[in-house]
UniProtKB/Swiss-Prot annotation:
GO cellular component: extracellular region
Enzyme class, first EC level, given as a word: hydrolase
Active site location: 289
Bias (Pro residues) ranges: 681-691
Enzyme Commission number(s): 3.2.1.21
Protein name per UniProt: Probable beta-glucosidase F
Domain of life: Eukaryota
Amino acid sequence: MRVLSAIALVASLASSALSAPASESRVSTQLRSRDAEGYSSPPYYPAPNGGWLSSWADAYEKAQRVVRDMTLAEKVNLTTGTGIFMGPCVGQTGSALRFGIPNLCLQDSPLGVRNSDHNTAFPAGITVGATFDKDLMYARGVELGKEFRGKGINVLLGPSVGPIGRKPRGGRNWEGFGADPSLQAIGGAQTIKGIQSQGVIATIKHYIGNEQEMYRMSNVGQRAYSSNIDDRTLHEVYLWPFAEGIRAGVGAVMTAYNEVNSSACSQNSKLLNEILKDELGFQGFVMTDWLGQYGGVSSALAGLDMAMPGDGAIPLLGTAYWGSELSRSILNGSVPVSRLNDMVTRIVAAWYKMGQDGDFPLPNFSSNTQDATGPLYPGALFSPSGVVNQYVNVQADHNITARAIARDAITLLKNDDNILPLKKDDALKVFGTDAGPNPDGLNSCADMGCNKGVLTMGWGSGTSRLPYLVTPQEAIANISSNAAFFITDKFPSNVAVSSGDVAVVFISADSGENYITVEGNPGDRTSAGLNAWHNGDKLVKDAAAKFSKVVVVVHTVGPILMEEWIDLPSVKAVLVAHLPGQEAGWSLTDVLFGDYSPSGHLPYTIPRAESDYPSSVGLLSQPIVQIQDTYTEGLYIDYRHFLKANITPRYPFGHGLSYTTFSFSQPTLSVRTALDSTYPPTRPPKGPTPTYPTAIPDPSEVAWPKNFDRIWRYLYPYLDDPASAAKNSSKTYPYPAGYTTVPKPAPRAGGAEGGNPALFDVAFAVSVTVTNTGSRPGRAVAQLYVELPDSLGETPSRQLRQFAKTKTLAPGTSETLTMEITRKDISVWDVVVQDWKAPVRGEGVKIWLGESVLDMRAVCEVGGACRVI
């Protein structure tokens, strides 16, 4: 069976850009157009070479020895995908077999191996974020790395830390870890470390400003929207998680489809050359999102290193911006040989750094079919066939971690009268299709492009097939001795009600990627808004009208409105189970029946009304004319906005109840590194980078080999007449404005992976003792927020910077948690000096500790005392 999702994506690219989503008329108050704001992205050339950091020195030394002996064809092969459907993976490069480098396999997704078999479908990123558990974040990364390696995948296309969740209706928010830069940063970094510990290259994405799905891609009818972001907001919010991912040593970065400040991300020299490779010291390689390359020479000069899946503007035509055209650009001199050498060296260095030159398996699965045999290159139409699926089981015992994450993410919003946990003999009436299976069968919807049965993940390329699914219905039936099930979204008229009955109502809200439209929602939640799908609100209200005790279970991609029913006296408890993956049922019953106390916390704010958000974060729609999406709210997204506007949400960021209670005591603050200056000490100088001959290679290096058996539509580096291409080298290429080959001075904010290493000096350590003061075992989360002094200018009143989670505490027992605060954590970005500015010695900084952004338990003032609130 062909991959329907990829076909849908191709169709969407070829379709007219002149029509608005069908649901637009129903949500006109949420879809708005904006005029151009005059934002532009200044040029920054040339692209900095990699290899100047000691942490990558060995990998670059190995890469240099190989790359210096490569032909032009071999170099181009490694930078260009072979074309969509031209191999087993969603993307693969060409090879350099003389040096033992195979076609590199790149594969989704951040939660499991996409379009495969015998894999684990882990909980989604938003669920992982809700655990506030660094150990689980790392463990999931390790097991993802093991599974991808076991399938022969070189590059895992995750984690996602963008979108960050600026727009609550954004379609792909659920792939990341939550609507806060530090939560995203910690979740992303822990995941990267875990993945790469297994020798698989992680890819942090989508760089940057892809906060809406609609109109994200440029095509023949319309340019992608431009995310217009000021410099301070870019650094303090949207770059923050990418910087931490780079500091964690990530091997690859994927660009976003959209533009930033009127320049496409895949050829934005400011973003790629200056910020990513110079300021943040990124040593790996930059790839496009699939079919997100919009130019050849321009993208190479701007810092792009790999084009995926390789096709040009229209896929499956056998044409590319790179491939043979990159060979031509090298021969005619429009792309310097030095730029190509750096592109290839970055890719090969990442391959070496992960140890993939050792015993690394080749792909043993196919994204294109579930059959054992089939065409090796399905996009060619006429393709040799062979074994494409070996059905290698990579699951091991990873279901244990998957269940632990799904369980520890469950967030208890409300528990009146301590109705939870339930007893096994309670009389239960269970309502809602979200409790049951997909009636069409497991994995019946390609890339989860439907909302049928329990919602385990959103839809799109960020999904994986479920190897199995234990539904809430199955799990409850297995445990409860007295449960009746009504797997319908319309409240039945014939339900018998007894005085002791507990109604458990399941509702959901879904979203996903733009190439699939589900129930009128083209990725973003346009038709549904922030409401529950499938009559969910009415189902809860109808149950509340009949039963005196109602428990609501919510599976959702993000914030969901609850005002229609949350204050009804019958609605006693609400659990948000997020997107639990394959362990949806068991993880829920672990908490529902009290084997574990809930310990999840909201990774976003739940508002009382959608109008509580700033108007600038609504979805935008403007057919034909390019959309200008200007970030006028600046630093104030999610809870930061609610605090600034003095709006009380329904449930604040970080909120989460337990079956027990906790006290915070004995807060302490200690100085680790004295901050004796406003700005960090001078950055270390760059080390040497690999050097190569810069002469244009002989055209014969990209001539077609004799008796070569070509695959139709496969993207090769070869030219029919390479000598003719070389003869055109005297022509002057129309380079981008500001293009130069003269290197820029090293930015003062750089110096290592993630920036100036002094930014990550630990300035303070804060400790607090957490005690279980209740009657049941449980785990607590301490959230650390900083409040910066007025001397730094206007800043959000509280910003999450760290968190820590206790082990399971028995009643009456305690644990002391310690969290570290870096110089960067208490800094703001100085747009004039272009560096991070902190108060000297941290004077005026307050450090808040609590269980949510609105539930503070202790505060420490730098230079003063700590106290319990």
